[in-house]
Amino acid sequence: MMMEHEMATNRRPRAKRTPGDKLGKGGGDAALAPAADAEIPASSAPEPAAPISAPPAPVIKPVGGDAWASLLSGSPWSSPGAASPTEAALKPVMPSALAEAVANAPPEAAPFTELVSHWSPPFRRQPDREYEEINPAEAAIPVTAAAPEPEPEPVPEPEPEPEPEAAHDHAATETEGVTEMMTSDVELEIEIASDVEVVEAPAVIEPSPRPQAFSHSTAYAYPAEPAPAVETAAEAAPAGPAENPVKEVPVEDLFTGIFNVADSAVRGAIGASTDLLRDPKSLGGKLSVAGQSLVHSIKGRFNALLAPRHGAKSNGDEF
């Protein structure tokens, strides 16, 4: 108990160690005195944090001679910090294996359009169209509509000139002078002929010329006019209605006559059949008698029907 009390009394309070404190010569148990040179900041505001630079992009190494991967890894646009001038100035170094792979790579095939334009015949190629350059100043000028052409004025027709009266008078005087000269010449010829002896010459009878109306030229040129038709009294009279040779018979009378004829024919056939059964030898005579009676009955029926139409009495023999 006494030992513990002494140890408690010998202990001294230790201050909290700060980064600026220095260790004493007595080791860890020695008291750390605060530094007299420590400057106390005037303001209590915290200092601004230093900017943290982005980590550099990982470099992709080519695997198995991949040329495209190495080119993309060294491209300045593939890294996130490509804006910095230090990283943009860095250039990738192509290894020898990659250079050999690029040199030995087969050439890429040209596109289809280039092959067609190269191997196609020259006459099938269409030349490029040349367009004239449009002057903006000329293009800005508005185009005005063409002025309508004036219609041609109608040419007035020249009026007929009136004939002068002096011309008629001059022509009349000329004709009068000519007639006077002709009459004087005729009188001189008559006087000369009276002085000379007259010798009678035999008269020559010339055939009269064919009249012009009967010449061949006029016959073909002017067709002969047809002679006017003379209408007779019979033709001028109006034609009456033609007589119809077939007489009109009422339908009722026609049907009654047909039924009567059929009735008599049936009765005659029945009587002939009964007589044939009774006496087969007298069949011929009875048939002739029955036929005659049938014919007479038919005639009588039709004469009776046609008698009112003719307006006269008809005997049984008339049909």
Curated annotation (Swiss-Prot):
GO BP term (any one): magnetosome assembly
Transmembrane segments: none
A Gene Ontology term for the protein's cellular component: magnetosome
UniProt biased composition (Low complexity): 30-52
Disordered as annotated region, ranges: 1-59, 145-176
UniProt subcellular location: Magnetosome
Superkingdom per UniProt: Bacteria
Phenotypic effect of disruption: Single gene deletion, no effect on magnetic response, the magnetosome chain or MamK filaments. A double mamJ/limJ deletion has wild-type magnetic response, but forms large gaps in the magnetosome chains reminiscent of the mamK deletion. MamK forms bundles in these gaps, but the MamK filaments are no longer dynamic.
Keywords: Biomineralization, Magnetosome
Compositional bias of kind Acidic residues: 150-164
Function: Regulates the dynamic behavior of MamK filaments; paralog MamJ also promotes MamK turnover. At least one other protein besides MamJ and LimJ is required for MamK turnover. Might connect magnetosomes to MamK filaments.
Free-text domain note: The center of the protein is Glu- and Pro-rich.
Family statement: Belongs to the magnetosome MamJ protein family.
Note: This bacteria makes up to 20 cubo-octahedral magnetosomes of about 45 nm in diameter which contain membrane-bound crystals of magnetite (Fe(3)O(4)).
Protein name: MamJ paralog LimJ
Organism: Paramagnetospirillum magneticum (strain ATCC 700264 / AMB-1) (Magnetospirillum magneticum)
Source taxonomy: Bacteria, Pseudomonadati, Pseudomonadota, Alphaproteobacteria, Rhodospirillales
Record gene name: limJ
